[in-house]
Amino acid sequence: MPFKTLSRRTFLTASSALAFLHTPFARALPARQSVNINDYNPHDWIASFKQAFSEGQTVVVPAGFVCDNINTGIFIPPGKTLHILGSLRGNGRGRFVLQDGSQVTGGEGGGMHNITLDVRGSDCTIKGLAMSGFGPVMQIYIGGKNKRVMRNLTIDNLTVSHANYAILRQGFHNQIIGANITNCKFSDLQGDAIEWNVAINDSDILISDHVIERINCTNGKINWGIGIGLAGSTYDNNYPEDQAVKNFVVANITGSDCRQLIHVENGKHFVIRNINARNITPDFSKKAGIDNATVAIYGCDNFVIDNIEMINSAGMLIGYGVIKGKYLSIPQNFRVNNIQLDNTHLAYKLRGIQISAGNAVSFVSLTNIEMKRASLELHNKPQHLFMRNINVMQESSVGPALSMNFDMRKDVRGVFMAKKETLLSLANVHAVNERGQSSVDIDRINHHIVNVEKINFRLPERRE
């Protein structure tokens, strides 16, 4: 109604409404349950999202709708939700910051391109999104430099492709207690699908039920191109709790076409289980400086690796914690069970299973291992070594199927050898070449107790 036609009755009614807006009842009116972002100014999405979050509990980006040029930070208020059915796009500098109780959810067709989700609170949820874009270093960032405790993080059902890192956690300054990262598909990445870095304060972390495909770092970055990586801080052979990444499970992972699938540095109290790997070879991330292995463990204590199936892939590396050529720690106290590696149809030799283990009070248990056209290699000497139900075949032109290098007396790494109350226990262990002949190399046996049953090779005479 034009102002010049305003009647006295209309004017009085409007005046009464203005007075009502100043009453306590009016100020207490809650935000609407949901608002639609396409009802706001399309020429300034930053201001529009800020206004929308102030007016609604959930801000919806409708299907088929595109919000572009999101190139700065937007804070999602505590307890509020961004629900994406359309598309949000930026140039790599934009981010949505999640605070306590914030959620970013998606539906079919909902996605983000070149925008980062920055987690800075407890009880946050990121779910049901497609994410992509090489603009930002990572699609989801969890960390920051402020000291805080963040609890109950949920990341579920994401599809992340054609990006650098998918999920990056920098954990030195803060703590996460309880994180579930589940049911995602990661493909065509330059960086890691999940990197949980210097996460020495975190606990109760579950990373499970993911598909990882085609991770190939071609941009020259060092240490990029891992499927799932977790790391503590400085290696220490005493394995102090406050320097290790710990209390986590990595489970139900299907991975293919990358250089390294699972990676742990300076970790303890963890489980890796139910891994299915194909084509984990050196053809990927050739200049990234990372070892080729389905599972790579460096300087770790008290862990379990169980039910790993690998085909045409490099197997497992369990090795020293090394910095600048200095051997700082050796793996100890772990179980490796139910491992299958079949490289029968691979055109070239790859790592089978290489294990370095030791320390004065330590154990290693290797059980139910079957490998074809791959070698099992043991280096250094843990206090107690148990090997059960192991069948290994390697071609004679490559080397022995089973090698045990216990004698490290002339090696700088001999400092990690166990020397007191040592035990070697072997049962149902068979190592052969392609002709079915025994294929074993053992340098020296001087264990205090040796128990042997059903093996296809002779042990060297015991020497002090």
From Swiss-Prot:
NCBIfam families: PRK10123.1, WcaM. It comes from the Bacteria. It comes from Shigella flexneri. The lineage of its organism: Bacteria, Pseudomonadati, Pseudomonadota, Gammaproteobacteria, Enterobacterales. This is Colanic acid biosynthesis protein WcaM. Pathway: Slime biogenesis; slime polysaccharide biosynthesis. One of its GO terms (biological process) is lipopolysaccharide biosynthetic process. Coiled coil: none annotated. InterPro entries: Colanic_acid_synth_WcaM, Pectin_lyas_fold, Pectin_lyase_fold/virulence.
